[in-house]
Amino acid sequence: MHHRTDTEESAVFKPLAVAVGLGCAVLSLGANAYQYGEYAGETLERLITDYPGRYRGTASFAGASELMQSRLGFGYQTSRQDFTWAGNRSSQNVIASAPGSSGKFLVLGAHYDTYYGRPTLQGLDDNASGAAVLTEIARNLGGIALENGLEVVGFGAEEEGLRGSRAYVESLDASQRANLLGMINLDSLVTGDKMYAHASSNSVSNPALGAYREQILRIARELDIPLFTNPGLNAEYPAGTGCCSDGESFNGMDIPVLFIEATNWELGDLDGYEQTDNPAIPGGSTWHDPAEDNKEVLTNALGQERIEQRMRDFSRLLTRLVLELTNADLLASTASGGALARQMEDQLQRQHQALTRLHDRRWLTLLGSNRPVGSFDGEVGAEGEVSPDSGFDMPGDPESRRAGVHLLGDYRYSEALTLGGSLAFQRSRDKLDHGGRIEGDTWQLGLFGLYNDGGPEWLAGELNLGHTRYDSKRSVYLQAAGGPVLLDQRLSGDTSAWSWGARLEGGYDFSFGELRSGPLAGLDYMRYRIDDFREDEALRTALGYEKQDYDSLEASLGWRLRGELALGARMRLQPYASLRWVRELADGRLEDMDLTSRGDGRVRVADMGGVDKDFGRAQLGAQLAITEQLGVFAEANSRFAHSEGNQASYSLGVNWQF
C-alpha cells in the first residue's frame, strides 16, 4: 500500500529479458491440479517465506522477481522492465503478455515489493496477497483464447512512490495508449475486515469510467461473495472511489481503473487506512510493520481460513471479471453456439436419413413381393435408434437417441410400377458436452415410387417434406488447464426447421440363388432451413442465431446385397447390406455462421469447420416377417472415412402390415 506523495520523477524503460512461458505446459496438469485460491496460496507462501524484505537492491527482491516471472509464465510471454529514478535508484517490473484478436488489451497489476529498508518485513498483506492473486488469475486464463489481450504486471517500487506503475505508463507508445482498455489494481487483500472494489477518482466527472466497479459488483452478487465499495462517509473520498496504489498512475489516461483491496472504510478517519477493528491488530492496521504484517500474527488474529478465503474469493471474482473484460467468455460462447448450430444441422440430416431408410426397407419388401395390380397395402410401425459417441474407425459424434412411428401405404399401379406415401413422426435427442442437449420433434411427409418389372433392373424415387421443432440447451464451459472451472453456464433456446427434397436411386441385381447383389447409384437433393432464434437467458453469453439455409446434393455409388430366406412357421427373413461411396456436390452444411452476443451486441463468426465431401456409408440389416402382418427389423448404419467421425447408429423396429 502506497501512502500519498506529491513527488513526480521520470522513469526510463529498459527491456531486460523475454521468455516464453508456455514451456510450463510440459508439467503434468493432472498431477498439479489446483482449486481456486491454491495457486495464489503457493505464490504467497513463497514470497513471504523465501523473500521477506523485497525492496530494490536486495537479493530478496531479485529472487522475488524470478519467482513472479516463473509464476506468471503459463501461457504468456514474460519479460522484465528495468526503470530508474532520482539518478541512481532502480527497480524493475515483471510483465506477462497474452495477445488478443482485437489488438486492444487490459492491464492487471499488483506490486510485489515491500516497504523500503525493512529486511524482515514479510509483507503478507501488503502486498504478497495482491501479487499472489495476480499470479493465479494469470494462471487461470493461461492458454484461453482472448479477444482483448491481457497484460499482467508485477510492479516494483510501489512503496517508493508508485515508481513501477509510473514507469510502465510512461513506456507506453501512442498506439498502446489508444488500445489500452482499462486497468485493475490489487493491493492488500487479507488484513481488512471487508473486501472492496472502487473506481478511480476520474469516475467522479465521468461516471462511465466506473463501469468495472459496477461489473465486479454484479459478478459478486451472482457468485454470492460479499463485496463492498467506499460508502463515501469522508467527503475527500467520494462514494465508490478509491486511491493510493498503482492504479493512480493510470488516472490521467481516461480509462476505467479498478482498485481491489480489503480494509474497513467505516473506521477511524473513514479513509480506508484503518483496516480492522480486530483487537488482535493493535492500531487497526498492519501496513509496513514487520511485527504485524506476517503470517504468524495474521493467522493468530484472523485464522488460516481468512488467508485461504481471500485468495479463493478474490480469485473467483477477478478471474470472472477478466474473462468478461477480455471477452474470453464471449469467444467461448461463440464457439459453443457454433457447435450447437452444427449439431442442429446434423440432427436435421439424420432425420432425413431415417425417412430414406424407411423407404429403402419398403422398396426391399416390394422387390420381394408378387402383388396383383390394383392392390393397396399399408404398414404402421415404430422404431428406436441409438447413436453412441464412439464407433468403428474413429470417434463418433455426440450420443443421440431417436424414437419414431410411421404410417405408409402403396398402390400397385401396374406390373412394374408401385406408388405410395408415408407420414412419420420422430423424437430425437442429442447429448452435448457438460449437460447440453438438442431435442427435436419432427413430422415428415413422403411420396415414393418403385419401378421394377421383375427383371434385374430397378429404379426408385421419393419426394419429401419435413418440419422440426427444436428445443436446445447448451453449456458455456471454460476450465483452467489443470485448474478450476472458470465458467459453467446453461443457455436454452427453441426454433423451427424445414426440409424438403427429392431422391432418385437405381441399380442392377445379379441373381445368386436366393441372393441378389449388384451395383447401385443415387442422387439425393435436400434443402434445409433452420429459423433464426435468440436464447432465453439474460446472460451476456446468450446468443442470437441467424437463419441457417443450405443445400445438400449427395451423389452415391456402391454395391448392395439382399436376400430372402424361408424359415419355419411361415416366417421369412430378408437380410440386406450395402456399401457406398458418397460425394457431396453442394453445401452439405454451413461452414460458418453469424452469432450475436447479448453481452455487447456484436456479431461474431462461428467457425463450424470444413465440410468433408467424400466419405463412405455402410449398412447391415435384416427384416423378419413373423406372420403375414407382423414384422420386425434390426439395422446398423455407419458413416466412415469422414473427418468428423463415423456416426454409427443401431436401430430396432416393429411394423404391422394391413
Residue ranges and their predicted role:
Residues 43-99:
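A non-catalytic alpha/beta surface segment that caps or lines the substrate-entry region
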Residues 28, 34-63, 69, 113, ...:
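N-terminal capping segment at the start of a domain
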Residues 392-400, 431-438, 469-494, 529-551, ...:
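Solvent-exposed, glycine/polar-rich loop segments of beta-barrel outer-membrane systems
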Residues 119-208:
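Acidic/histidine-rich catalytic neighborhood of metal-dependent amide-processing enzymes
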Residues 194-328:
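Active-site-adjacent substrate-binding region
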Residues 545-658:
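Outer membrane beta-barrel transmembrane domains
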Residues 339-512, 636-637, 642-649, 653-657:
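Outer membrane beta-barrel translocator domains of Type V secretion systems
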